[in-house]
Amino acid sequence: LDDWLSNEDTKNLISRERPRNSYSYFYCFNFDPQFDAEYEPDNWRKAVNNENFRKALSSALNKTKEVAVLEPNVPEDYVIQTITPAKFTYNADGTDFTEIGDMAALGDTFNEAKAVEYRDLAKSELAAEGVTFPVKVLLPYNPTEVNWDKECQVVEQQMESLLGTDFIDIIVQTGPTDGFLTEIRRNGKYAMLKCNWGADYADPETWTDPFYQAKGENGYD
């Protein structure tokens, strides 16, 4: 480490944390809500366990429009469609990992027609289970992160406009300035939340850690 720090060619490569471009961002659904009763956690629990409900929300999210809050010029360059981001690893032929096999066919998950189709299926299924509408979707953000509040506003307006305010009620909530990760995500005080993950090593598998767990593990923390 001392050699790197003393070398003009390498000293700027040392950082106390990962560079910001070494993170992926994605939304998580909370299947074990611990938020206040006013946001109807039991109702949310029933709704989020319905596959068509989850597909409706996923298909209704226009990621490009959200990313445009942060990068208005070329937002599509920052939208990822795979768990492993593009331009991270390549095979021996120089082909991007995300363009190999079935991943090459993956496209934008935003699909208005599919979102409405899933919504209608979810409505009838959830109504039979006693779910009340609109389903409250608690969406907190960290006020110390620049423009995260604006991202949430765009998500709220865009998704409610497509799915209808009679189906979902996205509630944007300001989280704490200190200890956001522990207070909100780790304590389950959200319905839907923008989360992130960083690469630990130079292999595509490093990005999959939040999405599976071994027996006895508590999952993404």
Predicted regions and their residues:
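Extracellular/periplasmic solute-recognition and catalytic clefts
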Residues: 1-36, 68-70
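Short helices/loops that flank or line small-molecule/ion binding pockets
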Residues: 1-8, 52, 153-161, 178-191
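Secondary-structure transition/capping motifs at alpha-helix termini
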Residues: 7-14, 126-129, 160-167
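Structural recognition of the beta-strand scaffold that forms the well-ordered cores
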Residues: 16, 25-30, 56-60, 67-68, ...
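Periplasmic solute-binding protein
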Residues: 18-45, 58, 85-97
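Acidic-aromatic pocket-rim loops
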Residues: 19-23, 28-36, 174, 178-221
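Extracytoplasmic/peripheral linker and loop segments enriched in polar/acidic and small residues
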Residues: 46-55, 59, 63, 67-70, ...
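Append "and occasionally in soluble cytosolic enzymes with long acidic Gly/Pro-rich linkers
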Residues: 47-161
